[in-house]
Amino acid sequence: MANWCMSVLMFSFVTVYTIVTSLGQGIRRGFRAIVDEVENIYGDMCAGFKVALSKLSVSWIVVVGMIFVLNSLVVGLVPTLTMVAIIAACVGAKYGGRVPRYIRAHVDRIRKSWEKGVDDDDCCAPLPETSLERVPTKLRPRLACKIAVRAIAKVGLLKRSEANSMVYQRVCLDVMESMKMRWHDRLVILPQAVLACLERPEEVEEVMKAIEASCKGRFDVYXGCLLQHRGYNTAIISAIPDGVLLNHEGMVVRKGAPITTERKWYSFAGYASTYEYIVHNSSLVNVCRGLVERVFCVVRDGKLQRPLRPKNNVFERKLGNVGRRISSIVGYCPAMTRSEFCESYSGTRRATYERARLSLDVLPCTRKDAYLKTFVKAEKINITLKPDPAPRVIQPRDPRYNVEVGRYLKPLEPRLMKAIDKLWGEKTAIKGYTVEKVGEILHQKSLRFKNPCFVGLDASRFDQHCSRQALEWEHSVYNAIFRDPYLSELLTWQIDNVGTAYLKDGFVRYRVDGCRMSGDMNTSMGNYLIMSCLVYQFCKDIGIDASLANCGDDCVLYLEKEDLPKLKALPDWFGKMGYSMKVEKPVFTVEEIEFCQQHPVQLSRGYVMVRRPDVCLTKDLCVVRGGMTTERLQRWLYAQHDGGLALTGDCPVLGAFYRRFPSGESHGELSEYSDAHKFKAGKQYGEINSLARYSFWLAFGITPDEQLAIERDLMNWTPNVVPGSCDPRPTLLDYCSDN
């Protein structure tokens, strides 16, 4: 009996205690909710009054005051104040800019997860073999913080902005992919992870605020003075090895008096010193090395060797039908008269061809007119990436020969580009388009594929590997279109090439079989034709559905990711055709495509081709034109300002860079381009938006915060024509250029 009574008493006590405790917790929660609600309503009311006061003018204040007084007299003061409070709360909730409660709840959960710590997260831990199990709802905020730790470790502590949130979203997705997380968990955890990247622990935020305060008011001034440089002679003396030349080939070198004059070129001290450039002299040692390593031989396995040669009759077997299809697509193409050819040019080039035309009226074109007159190209060479490279030589023929062959091939070029497009079934020969149109084409090509993959095809020394077989096949396409024996004879003179180089310190005479000459009228068109048809036939042979963007020897192949292993056969296939081809690392976003040393970036105008910023900020400060005076250099700066902004006015970093060039009423020198007047009005472009900064990061690896930091530094740099000296200094761009 006693035990039974004790049990009843204990049960009653526990029941009463449980009920009282539950009621107490409920009352506390209700009271807390009421207090929170009162705080929210009070905050909304205050925000509403602020909005009303900021919007009301004096006349509106008078009208509202009269309404308030009349309403108080009719219904009373208390109801009127209540109505005003309700209206103010509604206005504040809608337009007061207060963060909604559900957003504050998410932020609070993330902050609590940060407080619990993520010390057990190991960013170097091996990836799981199988997909993770379903993540419980309570653990999602903490897992989001762990993902945020890895994301921050990759791109750093970025400030709160829309562009940076897109960067964090992309990196968090990559982290989730490496963790092999379930698709549904990615959906629900991704926004929490992005929020965790931006809502960092309090101790981190305090240090970031301290850094920001320390940097305020401190900046460096970058002097953009004028620097003068001397031409460069290569330190490597190259000679053709024995057993490399064919029987009728050879190179004769005669030395003269040592050179006493050198090329002179200028640059402006830049904000960045990432790369160093040189310009080769027009000297005997440079011409000899350029001919040996860029015409006769290639460096393979550390030795000078003959370029690859195609197998016998391989071009006719592989590309015979393709060439005939191209010629049939082109159909009839009328040749120009000599006068029409000359009139298609302007400026000094037109005057040169006019003199050649007049001489052709007296003396017909001969074999000697096709001889090459070789010289060293004055171009900016990046010796930071490749110290002391072989100089590039230009090998033009006599203008008389160019007039004769050009009046056939110049009208053919646009027709041939369209024929290549029809062969592929879409725009393939990317020539003659604006940067906006090229960006649009590259983006549209990617939409063809479900899981697109983009692969660059690097043709090593493409001109040098154009063998006799390749040139004869190219010429057969032209001959099938024109069916003119005279053109056929002119084209044969491009196969057995004889050239000379007259220099102040010597003389070179050489003869080479095959090889594309850089000064020929059909150099660009021929490279488009050969490369497009080679890749087309390769895709047919291995059986892949692909799309090609071709700019001569620079190509990007679009294909499905599942077809990527089939490209392993490409180097051997091209090797049999006589070309040394390298398959570059595949990329999977449009911005990562590198085409003609540019990347497509989504700006306010859509996708636009943009050059690498580390190259622009160094190379575009070099002036290699001869006869530059102070006045011409000043006009050159004006032209850089106008031309740079026309292309990249709405582009991060580059727009700020070109705005620092001086602008003036004295425009740059007149162009020989026939429609130069179209550029006087300038390009129309919008503002730099968050999407542009995010796309720029995808293309070049420079985060939005880094972009803004570089732009702030550029505000303290201005190029000018005052001579001076400047020591290189490290900048943020030096650390971003490796991405």
Curated annotation (Swiss-Prot):
- Could you say which EC number(s) this protein's record lists? 2.7.7.48
Cross-referenced Pfam families: RdRP_3, Tombus_P33
The cross-references to InterPro entries, in alphabetical order and at most eight, read: DNA/RNA_pol_sf, Rev_trsase/Diguanyl_cyclase, RNA-dir_pol_PSvirus, RNA_pol_HCV, Tombusvirus_p33
Where does the source fall among the domains of life?
Viruses
- An MF annotation (GO) of this entry: nucleotide binding
UniProt record, GO biological process? viral RNA genome replication
| CDD domains, alphabetized | Aureusvirus_RdRp
Question: Would the keyword Nucleotidyltransferase be found if you checked this record's keyword annotation?
Answer: yes
Query: Which controlled-vocabulary keywords does the entry list?
Result: Nucleotide-binding, Nucleotidyltransferase, RNA suppression of termination, RNA-directed RNA polymerase, Transferase, Viral RNA replication
- Enumerate the catalysed reactions: RNA(n) + a ribonucleoside 5'-triphosphate = RNA(n+1) + diphosphate
Q: What class of enzyme is it?
A: transferase
Per the entry, what this protein does is:
RNA-dependent RNA polymerase that plays an essential role in the virus replication.
Q: What other remark does the UniProt record contain for this protein?
A: Readthrough of the terminator UAG occurs at position 223.
Family, according to the entry, reads as follows: Belongs to the tombusviridae RNA polymerase family.
Q: What is this protein called?
A: RNA-directed RNA polymerase
Q: Which organism is it from?
A: Pothos latent virus (isolate Pigeonpea/India)
